[in-house]
Amino acid sequence: MASIPNLNFAKWSQGTENEKAEFVKELGAAYTDIGFITIRNHGFGEDVQDELYHKASEFFGLEKSIKAAYEIDGLAGQRGYTSFGKEHAKGNEAADLKEFWQVGQPNPAYEGPEYHNNVSVGELPEFALSFKLAYQQLEGIGRELLKAIAVYLELDINYFESWVQGGNSILRAIHYPPITIDPGNSVRAGQHEDINLITLLMGASAEGLQVLNKNNEWIGITAIPGSLVVNVGDMLQRLTNGVMKSTTHRVVNPPRETWGTSRYSIPFFLHPVGKMPLNALSNCISNDRPKAFEDITAGNYLEQRLIEIGLKK
């Protein structure tokens, strides 16, 4: 178990002013240090999580030919199915040992090229509804966390609201299949940083997630039962000029004796609308911390990163 702070989300969502201030302080300390926290008492339904994992395992258990029918050209994996070995970490040509399914915003802020229709699975009638319900719950928790982040950054509490309402967030169900041959240099997910503002991860089905701490040591992360793992992504790191850390992480292969087991993971990547500028906040720039990143919009940054990880040509 890694020493990732476990925060009581109820302090923020239901607490007194003092408790809210305590939560903001704890959140800020963690995000400016290692960029990861776990939260408890968050309100995400355990029944919703269990149903989601059940539906995901049902889908990935379908025949390859059936799954392939839901892999849609031209969407860069942003909706529907992406087959095994298509994605790789930035700067690493070895393919990740995974397949995945992505669901996007059911209520887009506007009509734009980044928004695509979600895909239904004919063989699993309740599949889309399960994902929509989880998406909406996780989006709500994420938006509340962004309010706490805004307070820590001395911004208006609703600073992020207009940018994330109807934003381009993604719920991704990932299946890491059993390893049947020597994987060589490939791992289940190569070391990387997330693209988005923050990521919310419900309990994965097996060990394997590791985070690179500031001492350059890999530490294993296991979600405490009933908690969500929430980490900073590159967009928030850029916006805060590196004040908040988008930490490198990976999913390593299991010990050889457990190669025959699958691993499932379902992260929610909270994205803003594509129009949001990721220009560094003025109060995060100083003589000691000069501006570190070029100005770019969230949409253009996403496009750039999708190319780097092999999902877009």
Model-derived features: where do they sit?
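Peripheral, non-catalytic segments flanking oxidoreductase cores
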Residues: M1-K313
